[in-house]
Amino acid sequence: AAPIQYFFRQNATATRLVSIDIGGGTTDVAFAKDGDLQHVTSFKFASNDLFESSLDASLRNGIIDYFKKIVENKIKDIDELKKILDSNTKPSNIASFFFSLQENPAASDLDKSVINFDSLLREDEHFKIVFIIFYTAIIYHIAQILLLMGMPMPRHISFSGNGSKVLRVITSDSKLLAKFTCKIFQLLGVEAVDGKLEILGLGVDDSSPKQATCKGAL
């Protein structure tokens, strides 16, 4: 619930807020109204599920297998980065390495546009649907909780946690994502008080997802 406090401090207009903290193994959700925490829940469906299955120990993943060849070619002349990549075998660990690559000091001389994993995924039409389904599944689950609790559509949804970085693959436009989210709520019959929804935590000017989690605890 730490991100709840942070976003209420940063957003004076926040009234009905759902905080979604996506980690590697779990997604933690908190429902709040006017700064008061009303309900919390957690479920084992998070970013790692995009890159590996909890049902088997397979080291194969279509997304990672495809992009590993591309990234390997970009960093082939940087031993430090090659060693890190070669030392990771789990697809989820490789994905974390890819997402952090452009911020790695060892990659400072590389063109950021060619090692930006967010952009590579966003521009790829084959795998984007996987991330859209991932996001839709989370929002669907939250909609079911709202219906069960008799709660209306939130005015704001805030995202935090390193796992929420994958949502930027869908779009970098928070307003577009908000429209898509509203449509899901509407289709499932969630009451809309004013029909307005704002997505927080994913914009370029917002704090990083991990920072939002940490700052809320301060």
What are these regions (language model features)?
Residues 24-25, 34, 164-165:
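Short, glycine-/Ser/Thr-/acidic-enriched flexible segments
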Residues 17-21:
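Short glycine-aspartate micro-motif
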Residues 35-69:
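Short glycine-rich, Thr/Ser-proximal phosphate-binding strand/loop in the N-terminal lobe
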Residues 24-28, 46:
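Short acidic, Gly/Ser-rich segments with clustered Asp/Glu that frequently serve as metal-coordination loops
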